[in-house]
């Protein structure tokens, strides 16, 4: 590997506590999407009930057009993924009706289990990568994020972009693009 560019999510070195354990602790009394995705079948049933509304709400909520932190706004522990997310009308012009239809068709054909399984595997990732504790990225690394990315606020009160060079021996710089989501 000659170099790495992190997009939206800065590199996080392995730690004793898994990301799932940390987020479960932080969000113990309220909804957090990664915790929600750990349930078998429940997220799929919600998302697949109306794929168009699901994608519109998720894409908008994670975009720079939505109110700040819309994706992470406090929700009750028993809320669903789509509860309290806005389905904007009209939808912002950065995603045409024709392009959205392509994604809708793909998810109607393939479902959401595969994408949700990526989040269900975070505990497995933590175990599998335990051999990499104290290992740093030695190749050139840069980071690019958007000022409107929700990742910056995943841990309340912590700037998720404050230390993008952690775990990198050859960090070349960080760029935050104003007003957008990367």
Summary of predicted features, one role per range:
Residues 2-172:
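Flexible "cap/lid" subdomain of the alpha/beta-hydrolase fold that forms the substrate-access gate
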Residues 169-182:
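Short glycine-rich catalytic loops that host catalytic nucleophiles or stabilize transition states
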């Amino acid at each position: 590997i000659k170099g790495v560019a992190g997009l939206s999510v800065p590199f996080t070195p392995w730690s004793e506590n898994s990301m799932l354990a940390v987020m479960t602790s932080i969000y113990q009394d309220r909804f957090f999407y990664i915790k929600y995705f750990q349930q078998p079948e429940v997220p799929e049933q919600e998302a697949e009930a109306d794929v168009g509304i699901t994608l519109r709400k998720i894409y908008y909520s994670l975009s720079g057009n939505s109110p700040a932190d819309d994706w992470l706004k406090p929700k009750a522990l028993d809320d669903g993924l789509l509860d309290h997310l806005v389905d904007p009308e009209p939808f912002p012009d950065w995603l045409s009706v024709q392009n959205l239809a392509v994604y809708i068709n793909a998810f109607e054909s393939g479902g959401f289990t595969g994408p949700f399984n990526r989040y269900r595997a975070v505990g497995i990732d933590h175990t599998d990568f335990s051999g990499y504790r104290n290992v740093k990225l030695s190749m050139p690394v840069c980071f690019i994020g958007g000022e409107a990315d929700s990742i910056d606020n995943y841990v309340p009160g912590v700037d998720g972009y404050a230390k993008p060079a952690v775990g990198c021996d050859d960090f070349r710089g960080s760029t935050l693009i104003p007003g957008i989501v990367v």
